[in-house]
C-alpha cells in the first residue's frame, strides 16, 4: 500500500467513524465501529471493515442498514474529501476479528485455570444476578 492510499484510508476511517457516531440516525444501526479501511491503488474502491457488537441478528440488521446508507455515507465523504476528484466506492465488510480474539482469550483463560487445578472462571455474562 502506498503512503497516499494509506493516508486516504486513515482519513476515510476517521470521517466514517464520526458520521456513524454523530450523523447516522437509523435506529437499525447498532453499536458499529469502523475498524479499518483499505483503499485500492487506483483509489476506486475502499474496503471498510466494520465491527458490530450484538447478536448475530443485530449484526446482520446493522450491516443491512449500513448497506442502505452507503449513498449517504459516500455523499458525506465527498463533502469532506473535496480535494479528491472521485470518491472511492465503499465496500462494507463485517469484521469479526474482535469476536475471534475474545473467543481465543476465553480458551486461554480456561487452559490456564485447568493447569492451575481450579475450575475455569465463568464469563461475565454467565454469572447469576445477585
UniProtKB/Swiss-Prot annotation:
Keyword Cytoplasm among record annotations: yes
Molecular function terms from GO: ribosomal small subunit binding
InterPro entries, per the entry: KH_dom-like_a/b, RbfA, RbfA_dom_sf
GO cellular component, one term: cytosol
Gene3D superfamilies reported for this sequence: 3.30.300.20
GO biological process, one term: maturation of SSU-rRNA
Pfam families (alphabetical): RBFA
Major subcellular site: cytoplasm
Cell location: Cytoplasm
Record has NAD as a keyword: no
Source taxon at top rank: Bacteria
UniProt KW keywords: Cytoplasm, Ribosome biogenesis
Self-association and partners: Monomer. Binds 30S ribosomal subunits, but not 50S ribosomal subunits or 70S ribosomes.
Function as written in the Swiss-Prot or TrEMBL entry: One of several proteins that assist in the late maturation steps of the functional core of the 30S ribosomal subunit. Associates with free 30S ribosomal subunits (but not with 30S subunits that are part of 70S ribosomes or polysomes). Required for efficient processing of 16S rRNA. May interact with the 5'-terminal helix region of 16S rRNA.
UniProt cross-references to PANTHER family, sorted A to Z: RIBOSOME-BINDING FACTOR A, CHLOROPLASTIC-RELATED
Similarity section: Belongs to the RbfA family.
Protein name: Ribosome-binding factor A
Organism (species): Roseiflexus castenholzii (strain DSM 13941 / HLO8)
Gene name of the encoded protein: rbfA
